[in-house]
C-alpha cells in the first residue's frame, strides 16, 4: 500500500524537519498551512496518515486542525507534535 501523508503546518519551522524525516519512509507527502486547506480538500486527498505540526499559541489558534481531528481521527491515524498533540487532546 502506498502511503499518502498529509502534514498540516501550524506555521512552525519544525514542520519541514518532520517533512524530511517522514520523506525517508514515504515520498508521498503534502504540506498545507492550517488556514489554507479545507475539510473537503482533505477528503479529496484521501490521506492514509495525518501529521499535525507544532506551532505557536493554543489549539484554538490552530486553524482547521481540531475540525480535521474530529472528522478524520476515527479512521485515519493522526500524529500530533506539540501543538498538534494538544489539538488532539482538545478535539
From Swiss-Prot:
L-glutamine binds at residues 55-57, 86. CDD domains: GATase1_Anthranilate_Synthase. Keywords: Amino-acid biosynthesis, Aromatic amino acid biosynthesis, Glutamine amidotransferase, Lyase, Tryptophan biosynthesis. Pathway: Amino-acid biosynthesis; L-tryptophan biosynthesis; L-tryptophan from chorismate: step 1/5. GO terms for cellular component: cytosol. It is an enzyme of class 4 (lyase). Pfam families: GATase. One of its GO terms (biological process) is L-tryptophan biosynthetic process. The active site is at residue 82. Residues 4-91 form the Glutamine amidotransferase type-1 domain. It catalyses: chorismate + L-glutamine = anthranilate + pyruvate + L-glutamate + H(+). InterPro entries: Anth_synth/Amidotransfase (IPR050472), Class_I_gatase-like (IPR029062), GATASE (IPR017926), TrpG/PapA_dom (IPR006221). Its EC number is 4.1.3.27. GO terms for molecular function: anthranilate synthase activity. Part of a heterotetrameric complex that catalyzes the two-step biosynthesis of anthranilate, an intermediate in the biosynthesis of L-tryptophan. In the first step, the glutamine-binding beta subunit (TrpG) of anthranilate synthase (AS) provides the glutamine amidotransferase activity which generates ammonia as a substrate that, along with chorismate, is used in the second step, catalyzed by the large alpha subunit of AS (TrpE) to produce anthranilate. In the absence of TrpG, TrpE can synthesize anthranilate directly from chorismate and high concentrations of ammonia. Heterotetramer consisting of two non-identical subunits: a beta subunit (TrpG) and a large alpha subunit (TrpE). This is Anthranilate synthase component 2. It comes from Acetivibrio thermocellus. The gene is trpG.
